[in-house]
Amino acid sequence: MARIAGVDLPREKRVEIALTYIYGIGLTRAKEVLARTGVNPDTRVKNLSETEQSALREAIEKTYKVEGDLRSEVGQNIKRLMDIGAYRGLRHRRGLPVRGQRTKTNARTRKGPRKTVAGKKKATRK
């Protein structure tokens, strides 16, 4: 099993698709890496030679920030926005959409399930 950047790549998938299992590498970057290393994108992970695996591993680790490093950088960026009191930081802190979306309706993904408030109770007749 090929292990690149601490991620076990699925053996039955094409290398091009398997590389996208690494956080920080999408389809475009996967194609770039394969072109740079000269590995055929249609090769299955189980058919990769040891030299191809090491070439891919080296190319990814030297060129891109992936997995834990990238996750921590993103987290630090958000923390910095919150610390300096930027508007985007406030939105993160309150758990609301950050990029200007409407919140009167929608935004349920970011806000979570509705917190229902009891309506007015009907007066009882005497």
Curated annotation (Swiss-Prot):
GO cellular component, one term: cytosol
GO molecular function terms noted in the UniProt entry: rRNA binding; structural constituent of ribosome; tRNA binding
Protein's GO biological process: translation
Top-level taxon: Bacteria
Coiled coil (residue ranges): none
Repressor keyword on record: no
Keywords: Ribonucleoprotein, Ribosomal protein, RNA-binding, rRNA-binding, tRNA-binding
SUPFAM superfamilies found in the cross-reference section: S13-like H2TH domain (SSF46946)
Region (Disordered): 92-126
InterPro entries in the record: Rbsml_uS13_C (IPR027437), Ribosomal_uS13 (IPR001892), Ribosomal_uS13-like_H2TH (IPR010979), Ribosomal_uS13_bac-type (IPR019980), Ribosomal_uS13_CS (IPR018269)
Pfam families given in the database record: Ribosomal_S13 (PF00416)
NCBIfam families hit by this protein: uS13_bact (TIGR03631)
Annotated family: Belongs to the universal ribosomal protein uS13 family.
Complex and partners: Part of the 30S ribosomal subunit. Forms a loose heterodimer with protein S19. Forms two bridges to the 50S subunit in the 70S ribosome.
Function: Located at the top of the head of the 30S subunit, it contacts several helices of the 16S rRNA. In the 70S ribosome it contacts the 23S rRNA (bridge B1a) and protein L5 of the 50S subunit (bridge B1b), connecting the 2 subunits; these bridges are implicated in subunit movement. Contacts the tRNAs in the A and P-sites.
Name of the protein in its database record: Small ribosomal subunit protein uS13
The gene coding this protein: rpsM
